Amino acid sequence: MHPPQQHKFGFKAWIPTIGLAFAAFVFNTSEFLPVGLLPNIAESIQESVSKTGLIITVYAWVVSLLSLPLTILTAKLERRRLLLWLIVIFALSHFVVLWADTFEKLMGARICVAVTHSIFWSIMTPLAARVAPFGKQAFGLAAVMGGSIVATVLGVPIGTHLGQQVGW
């Protein structure tokens, strides 16, 4: 009787998982960062903090309401290609956020980010398990969820501090 075969995986085998964990970090930091910068954002677009807070509320509603329908609509698309498109749209939307000088432009860009977010998390879990090295799917999924946790614990506080110091 032979002992079970141990698979050894180098760094290269973990690159897709690390990439997904980083994407989870960026998506979650992006989602929650405006909470800490709300007064700065409101001042920059010359709106009240309460009205500007709608960029957070509407974001949450868009994600909540569109996650299931958009997941169904994109179910037949190849996941890696879909993820790449989501990241491109996510990045472009953030460039619009960066240059938004009115509430309407900011809200429109945040809605686009929320749409990408609504699909991102629905495909992330199965994709994380699929790209992890053989036999390490649970660890791969945990690593991706770890990216989300690190966003909450480090990304948002550090991003808020930097945004308050140098401008959002």
Regions found by a protein language model. Name each.
Residues 16-49, 67-70:
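Extracytoplasmic
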Residues 24, 56, 60, 87, ...:
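Small-residue-rich transmembrane alpha-helices and their cytosolic helix-loop interfaces
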Residues 28, 32, 98, 114-122:
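Small-residue-rich segments within alpha-helical transmembrane domains of MFS-like 12-TM solute carriers
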Residues 32, 60-68, 152-153:
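Residue-level signature of mid-helix packing/kink "hotspots" within the transmembrane helices
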Residues 65-104:
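Conserved MFS/SLC helix-loop-helix module at the cytosolic interface between two early adjacent transmembrane helices
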Residues 103-105, 135, 143-168:
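Helix-loop-helix hairpin linking two adjacent transmembrane segments in secondary transporters
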